[in-house]
Amino acid sequence: DRDGIDAALIKTDGYQVLEEGPFLTVPYKTAFRKLLENLIAGKGDLNKVEDQLTLEHAKAVSALIKNFNVAISDVDLIGFHGHTISHNPDKQHTLQIGNGGLLASATGVDVVNDLRSSDVKAGGQGAPLAPIYHKALMKSQDLPAIILNIGGVANITWADTLDENLIGFDTGPGNALIDDWIKKKTGRHYDNNGFLASQGQVHDCLLYTSPSPRDLRL
């Protein structure tokens, strides 16, 4: 999201998480956050910002392996989501900026990116992606299980088996819109520990009520 980059090392066979490695978060500088905000508003040089974002991710990869004494040759693959600029699956449209070729060149590691487009073009929602990872985590958990992920957009994953009964969908706005509101109303960057939210009341009429599976359109 616009806060920065989360980078993590995991060992996986593609079906389950075999080992959880180190992770770090690299905050974006205020000026770069503004560039992302401008792109979402339809302003700015998309290609220039995309390259800058990609190189910031390359720096995050470098910091991760350096801080935890990992050889880059031991990294087989980088999953690169990029940054969502617009998302409207009803019109078979989604756009995440991030140059996979540039990241591969900068790091020397193969990159998988543009993770949503094919699903959206095939008539899917393209979101959320988290349930795929949650399914891998659930292989070591007792079922049924529910995982709630509150990121920029909140989503939930539910499974009673690990066959075809995995359900995952967006539950509504997460920290992205909340952070924007907090910044506008208080000048702070976020609601620390949910203090302000805990003082409020739920407006049932404003809840996102369309049936699952669903995503939150941006």
Predicted regions and their residues:
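A glycine- and small-aliphatic-rich helix-loop capping segment at beta-alpha/alpha-beta transitions
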Residues: 9-17, 91-102, 135-139, 160-166
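Glycine-rich phosphate-binding loop and adjoining helix at the ATP-binding site
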Residues: 76-131, 217
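Short polar catalytic/cofactor-binding loops
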Residues: 1-3, 30, 215
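Single conserved hydrophobic/aromatic residue that forms the stacking wall/gate
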Residues: 208-218
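Short beta-strand-loop/turn "lid" adjacent to the catalytic site in phosphate-handling enzymes
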Residues: 44-100
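Glycine-rich phosphate-binding loop plus the immediately following alpha-helix
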Residues: 5-8, 22-38, 112-139, 146-207
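Glycine-rich nucleotide/cofactor/substrate-binding loop typically near the N-terminus or early
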Residues: 9-64
